[in-house]
């Protein structure tokens, strides 16, 4: 099986979002002066001296802490990729916020907190099954996605060149682009999986910061939280929650691929989205990975064609089943060495889909997350382009729900996550690429309620793995029935013997009847 390789990109401008929408880099820091100084510590508000909200006790400008522990895996280069020791190829100093403050200038609150001083717990936002949404809730979700696709981001921009060429050929023009909110969501994913650029036509492909390792679960969790907060602000609804798609149907059809939800297939070309769906006009970004590698450049947000799904020819493939979810949730180890796509009996690797759902390894089999992407095919089939499809949002919401259920069942200690020798980007204290300000994997290795949200869901429990009182009672009752039966048989035999007396052994006639035959 070819390992998943995914991606995303675009440019951003103004709307109703705030400084907590943490993505690539804040526009205010993408100046020649800031890039040369490698410092992104903007003031909060109009007062220039209020750097990082320091006058209000919200934060200060500080040295970036980047993980330097050794990594393992196929990436063996050093100082060749601008994502190493993220984000120090770009900035050495950023705002470090205190308490529950957050954001590139400490002007926001951490997930799950609110109030002027970020000291008030927000009510949990509840992520529901997309099929359980009311007509109004469904329209709000779909409309918010479409609005995000067409609304420039107010605060963040993306880079269109790697760090050595970031200031342009003359060193005076930062190579950046604006993007829509949703396309920035796509770009973040693309950037996390793109190849290392070594020269024209010389990509180094053995690298992935968001897949094939422990960070798969935390990276996608933060990615989804980022979008959810952006949509909350875009809609003016702080209780807005992205729904999930329970893909564990075991069927060979996509039940969210309808015109009422995320778009049916177009009758005259089933690889395109039905023209009755708002998503039929969505164009994709960051799809031409080979072209970027040839030109030694990054995705710049140019539209590259329509969104596609291609389930034609996939009829023999079926989505995961509830039994697969049950098997995955029975795995007690979060991850196992080598913390890569060949780890066995690893909850993370089974959920990601490189292991079978029960944790055994079969290189010819895809399961769970990987299987769903393969099933959708088209734009969803490759990591660098998959997030273009809005199904990505509800697919990963359900994947995160499974992760959250595992966290609640097993309450793993923090050292269940390796501090070192995971693939690059996947050590516990590595700053997740390309989120900014920096945030580590460890900070997301929590239950969802600690991050301000929950799921309206009941996931299956393995009877074998988690015996309860009903199982014990069934066993006891079965034993009692057997004892009563034996007692009755003994009494009957005793009765027969008393009536007929004894028959000498030599005179006994042995029966040749089988147990399944009538006497």
From Swiss-Prot:
Uppermost EC category: isomerase
KW Metal-binding (keyword) present: yes
Catalysed reactions listed for this entry: L-dopachrome = 5,6-dihydroxyindole-2-carboxylate
Pfam families: Tyrosinase (PF00264)
One cellular-component annotation, GO: melanosome
Signal peptide: 1-23
Membrane-spanning segments: 473-493
Cross-referenced Gene3D superfamilies: Di-copper center containing domain from catechol oxidase
Cytoplasmic side: 494-519
Keywords, ordered alphabetically: Glycoprotein, Isomerase, Melanin biosynthesis, Membrane, Metal-binding, Signal, Transmembrane, Transmembrane helix, Zinc
Record EC number: 5.3.3.12
Membrane topology: Single-pass type I membrane protein
Pathway info: Pigment biosynthesis; melanin biosynthesis
Sequence positions that bind Zn(2+) A: 189, 211, 220
InterPro entries to which the protein is assigned, alphabetical: Di-copper_centre_dom_sf, Tyrosinase/Hemocyanin, Tyrosinase_Cu-bd
PTM info: Glycosylated.
Function: Plays a role in melanin biosynthesis. Catalyzes the conversion of L-dopachrome into 5,6-dihydroxyindole-2-carboxylic acid (DHICA).
Subunit structure: Forms an OPN3-dependent complex with TYR in response to blue light in melanocytes.
Stated family: Belongs to the tyrosinase family.
Protein's name in the database: L-dopachrome tautomerase
């Amino acid at each position: 099986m070819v390992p998943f390789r995914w991606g995303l990109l675009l440019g951003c401008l103004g709307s109703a979002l705030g400084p907590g929408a943490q993505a690539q880099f804040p526009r205010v820091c993408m100046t020649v002066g800031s890039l040369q100084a490698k410092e992104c510590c903007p003031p909060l508000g109009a007062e220039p001296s209020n750097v990082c909200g320091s006058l209000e006790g919200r934060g200060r400008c500080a040295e970036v802490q980047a993980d330097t522990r050794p990594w393992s895996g196929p990436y063996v280069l050093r100082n060749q990729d601008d994502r190493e020791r993220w984000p120090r190829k770009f900035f050495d100093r950023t705002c470090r916020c205190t308490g529950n403050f957050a954001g590139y200038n400490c002007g926001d609150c951490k997930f799950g907190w609110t109030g002027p001083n970020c000291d008030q717990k927000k009510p949990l936002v509840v992520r529901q099954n997309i099929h359980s949404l009311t007509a109004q809730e469904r329209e709000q979700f779909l409309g918010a996605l479409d609005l995000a696709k067409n609304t420039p981001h107010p605060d963040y921009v993306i880079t269109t060149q790697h760090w050595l060429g970031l200031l342009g050929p003359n060193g005076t023009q930062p190579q950046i682009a604006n993007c829509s909110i949703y396309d920035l969501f796509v770009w973040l994913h693309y950037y996390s999986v793109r190849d290392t650029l070594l020269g024209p036509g010389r990509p180094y492909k053995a690298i992935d910061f968001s897949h094939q390792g422990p960070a798969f679960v935390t990276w996608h969790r933060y990615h989804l939280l980022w979008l959810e907060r952006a949509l909350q602000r875009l809609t003016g609804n702080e209780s807005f929650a992205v729904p999930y798609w329970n893909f564990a149907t075991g069927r060979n059809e996509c039940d969210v691929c309808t015109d009422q939800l995320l778009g049916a297939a177009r009758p005259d070309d089933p690889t395109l989205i039905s023209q009755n769906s708002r998503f039929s006009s969505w164009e994709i970004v960051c799809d031409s990975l080979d072209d970027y590698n040839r030109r030694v450049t990054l995705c710049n947000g140019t539209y590259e064609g329509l969104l596609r799904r291609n389930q034609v020819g996939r009829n023999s493939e079926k989505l995961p089943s509830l039994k697969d979810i049950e098997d995955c949730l029975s795995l007690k180890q979060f991850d196992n060495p080598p913390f890569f796509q060949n780890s066995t009996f690893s909850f993370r690797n089974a959920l990601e889909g490189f292991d079978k759902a029960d944790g055994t390894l079969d290189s010819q089999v895809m399961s769970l997350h990987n299987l769903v992407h393969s099933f959708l095919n088209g734009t969803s089939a490759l990591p660098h382009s998959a997030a273009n499809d809005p199904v990505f949002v509800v697919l990963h919401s359900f994947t995160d729900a499974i992760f959250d259920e595992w966290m609640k069942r097993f309450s793993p200690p923090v050292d269940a996550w390796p501090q070192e020798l995971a693939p690059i980007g996947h050590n516990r204290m590595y700053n997740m690429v390309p989120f900014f300000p920096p945030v580590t994997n460890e900070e997301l290795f929590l239950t969802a309620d600690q991050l301000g949200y929950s799921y309206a869901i009941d996931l299956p429990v393995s009877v074998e793995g988690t015996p309860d009182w009903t199982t014990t009672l069934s066993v006891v009752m079965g034993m009692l029935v057997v004892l009563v039966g034996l007692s009755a048989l003994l009494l009957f035999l005793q009765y027969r013997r008393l009536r007929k007396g004894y028959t000498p052994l030599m005179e006994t006639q042995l029966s040749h009847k089988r147990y399944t035959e009538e006497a």
